[in-house]
Amino acid sequence: MKLSIAKDQLIAGLQAVQNVVSTRTTLPILSNVHARTEDGRLYLTATDLDVTVTCGVEAQVTAAGATTIPVKRLFSIVRELPVGEVELETDDKNLTKLSASASYYKMNGLSAEEFPPLPKFKETGSVTLPQDKLRAMLKKTSIAISTDESRYVLNGVFMKFTPEKLVMVATDGRRLALTEEELPAGSTASGDIIVPTKAVNELNRLLQIGRAHV
């Protein structure tokens, strides 16, 4: 894999995914970010096996490929680089070479094949909402999420979808927070799910106010 990418693009991608990486993992591969190229973009993925986040950023790809790189080390290096283009190159032994201006680094990674595969879901419906509305709903309900790990079913936000509206509920057994939002015409989602606390926190962090729909 060989590519050139703007520092701010690489930083944005790493910031989007690195928070899900646990500092106490016993599996070395989970300390790494999965990096792969496709259609002129660099896709970064991190997981703790409960929550997985993927972010795609623009890059000038010279040679396609995939590898995994220690995410905390990569972020700390890129953050200190001067503004401009960053060159990334990975060989068949998963040694990644990074250069920018007069700076040059080498990082040993692990094979992309060792990285846990993304779960596959069968799409049964869809709904579109402005990011700020979804973020507001999560903010209103997440305050009541239970922190009692013995009551796992309460460790998240319950979402109920109908073609007409989305209802979110959270409770810790003492407090209950509920909010609902009418859905636009054409929504096809139906059913209910529980979104775990860590996923809710990541959504609250990643969703933007006044930005595009999700």
Please describe what each predicted stretch is.
Residues M1-R211:
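Structural preference for solvent-exposed beta-strand-turn elements
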